[in-house]
Each structure stands twice: as structure tokens, then as C-alpha cells.
């Protein structure tokens, strides 16, 4: 009987450990709700109804978290890395690489949640020398233009996942790899309507 209970306890411990390992693995994110909200928003505000950009800064910065979603095909056209802001100007931020902090405050170097309209294409001193101005559409990101928040590329950003390493930090701008920007640029130039970018 003792042996029986010993092996039973051993099996229970192994099962617990396996359960912990499975639970610790990050499950794929389901953005079905966000896609539906985004499409309705684009229709209501006369924005591009073919695709939009979704950035989930809740994910590890070494993993793909910039998604170009095709409304009609109902799938991601691209999944790539993107930076978040250092957010360390007005207070210390020891976890700045591990976790994105949000603020709409000017000069905060933080990322800001919410929906943006991708605006004018302009010259950039970074990456492939192209940037797009971002217009904040919500209270959480209304200072985007005052903060000079733009979508641009940067040589320091990898074009493929680098997890468990982290992507570099920006001053609040969503910066992508040069190769990714070369894909985004023609998409944006060819769009006859403004494109939605949504940061979670």
C-alpha cells in the first residue's frame, strides 16, 4: 500500500509540473473582437476597409506584435516586430524593456494606446528615410502630433523574432525594421483612404 501511494503521489507531482509547463506557454492571441471593432470604425469614419494595422504592445517585444490584417481575407498579411517607448523621462522605469508603459504626456517618451489615423508621408532621418505622421483619434493618444509620434523604420529593429531578447526602445514611436517598412510604404501610398493603426 505504501508503494501504491508513493507512486500515486509521484504521478500527481509529474502531472502538476506538466500542467505548470503548459500553463506557462503563451497561447496565441485571438483578435477577432478587435478586427470587428476596427472594421466598423473604418466604415463609420470613411477609412480604408481593405486592411488595418494592429499593434499589441502587451506581447514581448522580441515577438511579432505588429499585424497587418486583411479584412476581406480575414487573415494577417504580415506579422513583424515593433518597438515601444522607453517611458523613463518623468519617472524611473526599471521594467522598460519587459513591459510597455503608456502615457499621452508630451516629452514622456511613452507609447500611447488607442486608434490612430495614418497621415502624411514625410522624410525621416531614420531607417529607409520614410515616415508617416500619426494622428491620435482618442483621448489616450490625442497629443500624438505634439509628441511627434510617427511610424518609421530603424536599422536596430530586427526583421524576424528575437525572443527571448528584446527589441530596442523608442521615444514613443512605433518603429519597425527597414525591410518591413519597405512593405508597408507601398501599401500606404496606394491606399485611397486613410489607414487605421490601433495600439493595444
Model feature map: region roles:
Residues 198-199:
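C-terminal, well-folded lobe of enzymatic/effector domains
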Residues 4-13:
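Sec-dependent N-terminal signal peptides
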Residues 19-171, 178-195:
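Cell wall/extracellular polymer interaction/catalysis modules
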Amino acid at each position: 500500500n505504501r508503494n501504491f501511494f508513493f507512486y500515486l503521489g509521484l504521478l500527481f507531482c509529474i502531472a502538476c509540473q506538466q500542467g505548470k509547463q503548459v500553463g506557462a506557454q503563451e497561447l496565441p492571441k485571438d483578435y477577432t473582437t478587435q478586427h470587428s471593432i476596427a472594421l466598423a470604425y473604418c466604415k463609420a469614419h470613411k477609412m480604408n476597409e481593405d486592411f488595418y494595422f494592429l499593434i499589441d504592445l502587451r506581447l514581448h517585444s522580441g515577438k511579432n506584435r505588429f499585424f497587418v490584417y486583411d479584412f476581406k481575407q480575414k487573415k494577417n498579411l504580415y506579422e513583424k516586430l515593433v518597438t515601444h517607448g522607453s517611458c523613463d523621462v518623468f519617472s524611473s522605469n526599471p521594467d522598460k524593456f519587459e513591459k510597455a508603459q503608456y502615457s499621452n504626456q508630451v516629452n514622456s517618451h511613452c507609447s500611447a494606446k488607442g486608434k490612430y489615423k495614418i497621415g502624411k508621408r514625410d522624410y525621416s532621418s531614420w531607417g529607409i528615410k520614410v515616415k508617416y505622421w500619426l494622428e491620435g483619434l482618442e483621448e489616450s493618444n490625442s497629443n500624438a502630433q505634439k509628441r511627434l509620434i510617427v511610424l518609421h523604420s530603424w536599422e536596430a529593429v530586427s526583421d524576424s523574432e528575437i525572443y527571448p531578447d528584446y527589441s530596442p526602445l523608442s521615444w514613443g514611436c512605433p518603429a519597425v525594421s527597414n525591410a518591413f517598412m519597405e512593405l508597408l510604404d507601398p501599401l500606404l501610398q496606394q491606399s485611397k483612404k486613410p489607414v487605421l493603426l490601433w495600439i493595444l
